[in-house]
Amino acid sequence: ITWLSPLQNENYREYMLNSPIMLQKLNQNKLLLSREELNFWPQREPLWDAIGVGNMKDSEEKILVLVENKSNLKELRSKLASKNENNKRLILDTMKETYDELGIKGDFNKWFDTYYQIANRITFMHQLMKKGYKVKVVFLNIVEDYMYNNISKTQWVDEYCKMLNEIIGERFVPRDILIIDLKVHEDK
């Protein structure tokens, strides 16, 4: 994986996929994505904690890796906050389209009133895959960080199972999503 953000020489800046700098970086790495292909979402897109481009195994085909980092269980919960009615409508329509196309049985209301950030990441992945891109979304959870939030792997697993059951209708991790638990401090 070639990481495009966050980079030390850019002061660890996070990017939206549609930012001119990120589109240029993606294109330079042979992942040809245009702003028009992102028109399923308003101009103000989610900021990704990390964005990378990799090669598919035994192929020249590229894969887009989008990372969302979590260090606190409370960060899993969020609501759609857009005040612009046109933007809100576009977001809800795109999320509902994703929900329907994936055949999800969970509570759609939880997508925008309880677990919005997680659901919009799933939506981005699905919409890009519909356009022919290979995409992986990584939820990177910080585990047992006794210097900040001492959350165990068990706590993360329990919370994700609960969330997935509510938004997906089952306790499984959707295909092309990876949940990684990272222990940042090995010794106390």
Task: List PLM regions with ranges.
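A structured, charge-rich N-terminal accessory region that forms the first stable segment of a protein
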Residues: I1-L26
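Short catalytic/ligand-binding loop motif for oxyanion handling, primarily in non-cytosolic enzymes
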Residues: S59-E60, L73-R77, K130, D145-N149
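Conserved catalytic cores of phosphodiester-cleaving nucleases, focusing on short active-site segments
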Residues: A50-G52, I63-S71, R121
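Extracellular structured ligand-interaction cores
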Residues: E45-D49, K62-L66, D113-Y115, K134
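Non-catalytic C-terminal interaction segments of nucleic acid-processing enzymes
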Residues: A119-K188
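Active-site metal-binding core of divalent-cation-utilizing nuclease and nuclease-like domains
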Residues: L17-E60
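Acidic, metal/cofactor-coordinating or nucleic-acid-engaging core segments within structured domains
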Residues: E75-V137
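Short loop/turn segments at strand-loop or loop-helix junctions that form parts
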Residues: L66-L73, L140-E144
